[in-house]
Amino acid sequence: MTLRERAELKLGISGMPGVGKTTLVTKVLEVAKSKFAICGFITVEVRDGGKRIGFDIIDVNSGERKPFAREGIGMPSVGKYVINLGTCTLISKALRHKPCNLAIVDEIGAMEFKCPNFTTDLEEVVSNTPRILATIHRNYIGIAKRLGFEVIWLTRENWEMTYKQVLKRLGLSI
């Protein structure tokens, strides 16, 4: 079985920063919780005085939250953010949670690929989960497509339409 054969639905949401990719996935998650066994994680911005200083990871099942990246100097890093490799275990645990028939992956991007097991965990989710909703950093669309994702480009103008389309594709209604 190839990666493309298993998942019934692999939707990736990509777009420029600030268009609402994580917001869309979070809103879909709220509706989907009553219908699906969900696994995965959400990445949220951390702000101080209105300025983004980093990102936290939240396990969508347990609600456990850990710091993932902060401004600073150190390794590994992506741009101005230093990655907390200790949080990679939370990402792995969140993706491997069973049972799972809808995986939330927010996001597939450079920071997540700094985690030693992220590629393996992502491949396992793609192979073993019938539905996946992911946010895709715009520089990683090619990788997502190779994994069989259908990628939707999100803008502020098409946000509401895309949200409704994703719900419909998952068999959900609001």
Curated annotation (Swiss-Prot):
Listed InterPro entries: Nuc-triphosphatase_THEP1, P-loop_NTPase
Pfam families: NTPase_1
Gene Ontology terms, MF aspect: ATP binding; ribonucleoside triphosphate phosphatase activity
Catalytic activity field: a ribonucleoside 5'-triphosphate + H2O = a ribonucleoside 5'-diphosphate + phosphate + H(+)
UniProt cross-references to SUPFAM superfamilies, sorted A to Z: P-loop containing nucleoside triphosphate hydrolases
Superkingdom of origin: Archaea
Keyword annotations of the record: ATP-binding, Hydrolase, Nucleotide-binding
Role noted for this protein: Has nucleotide phosphatase activity towards ATP, GTP, CTP, TTP and UTP. May hydrolyze nucleoside diphosphates with lower efficiency.
Protein name: Nucleoside-triphosphatase THEP1
